[in-house]
């Protein structure tokens, strides 16, 4: 997970733990790219408004790297306009969830590999 707000990251980490996921957290875009390259996760939850490297750039970098290109990318962000969703899709995100995230929506996004932006 890539989330610069530590309270949000902690809350999501606890929820994901209840769902049975192992979670590594990075608090900035550059750290998120490094962590994904190191851990090679199946799923990456990523905020858009990150310091240094925004979530769109994180997604593009992960898609371009063979070791992370197949990870499922889910945007978890306060950016909820149609334009934000379009940019997420273009950057490589498969899903776009708007904060505060409904736990049921998150669970569906994690369980369903189909693109349902």
What are these regions (language model features)?
Residues 4, 28-31, 54-60, 102:
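Acidic catalytic/metal-coordinating carboxylates
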Residues 6-24:
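Two-component/phosphorelay signaling modules centered on CheY-like receiver
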Residues 39-45, 50:
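Active-site beta3 strand of CheY-like receiver
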Residues 51, 69, 81:
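The feature encodes the CheY-like receiver
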Residues 101-110:
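C-terminal output helix
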